[in-house]
Amino acid sequence: MAAPTAGVAASSPAIHTVELTKRFGGTVALAGLSMTVPRGEIFGFLGPNGAGKTTAVKLLLGLLAPTAGEAWVLGQPAGDLDTRRRIGYLPELFRYQSWLSAREVLALHCELAPLPRATWNEEIDLALTTVGLADRGGDRVGTFSKGMQQRLGLGVALLGKPDLVFLDEPTSALDPVGRHDVRGIIRDLAQRGTAVFLNSHLLSEVEQVCDRVAVVDHGRVIAGGTMEELLTGSAVRVRVTGLTVDGQKSLESFGPTDAEGEQITFTKLAADRVPELVAEMVKLGGRVYEVVPRHQTLEDRFLQLLHED
């Protein structure tokens, strides 16, 4: 595939992969990953441990070479040095020099980028303010809590106003207030045109901020699309007593269920079948106390997809 021209690169997706594959000896870590991340969108990359998420990120950052397939980042082949200067990255495992102040850590990364020295103070001030550390810039990192260090790591990722930011579990060390702050930062990034590639196990958080999601398992995408496209299912929770084990089993004709005590949730039940369900429960000797429509959450859909896969 020929390299795009400057005009094409500027209008191309933030990320585009075609059958991206990575093998380590006889182990397939990534098996034909194909996906597109538009610019200016928040993209959730989800999957269980061992699904291939970390391998995919390393390939996109140019830290690993693919076994097969292609990956383009900001219109250029993954790993292109000039393109990497336009990318911010917060790794899941972050550790900064404990003897340096927050400002010194940010200055070090300004130098590594490298950013023009004349812009350093402005960049550092903006990063500290954005992540809520404006009054701690002179303090040594060794005095910071883990949550404060994660905020600092996010500040590092934002230096230079990148066009694409990879965030790997960006709120794992934060309290609820900190998580709320980071969600706001992520939304602000998207509003200014920055694409955000978000890897998080906090699915409720992903549901709140992401425009688009891909679910991966065993190194391949098993579902993807906008949040609206992914969460199309309907569910109904019924509180019922008096059903025998056989009676409850016979209700499987109404679709997958999740039972807990007196409550049975039918995870893929169309609304027009609810009267039929209630009538069947009564016929089986059940006493129905409550029927509640339930919005399908991203966690519901995620678990359902993994079960089906």
What residues fall within each predicted segment?
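Alpha-helix C-cap/termination motif
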Residues: 189-192, 233, 284
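ABC-family P-loop ATPase nucleotide-binding domain
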Residues: 1-21, 308-309
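ABC transporter nucleotide-binding domains
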Residues: 12-17, 22-217, 221-223
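A general boundary/transition motif marking the beginning of the first structured unit of a protein
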Residues: 8, 97, 112-116, 174, ...
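Short acidic-hydrophobic catalytic motif
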Residues: 228-232
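Intrinsically disordered, low-complexity boundary segments flanking structured domains
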Residues: 222-227, 279
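Short, charged/small-residue-rich alpha-helical element at the C-terminal edge
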Residues: 235-305, 309
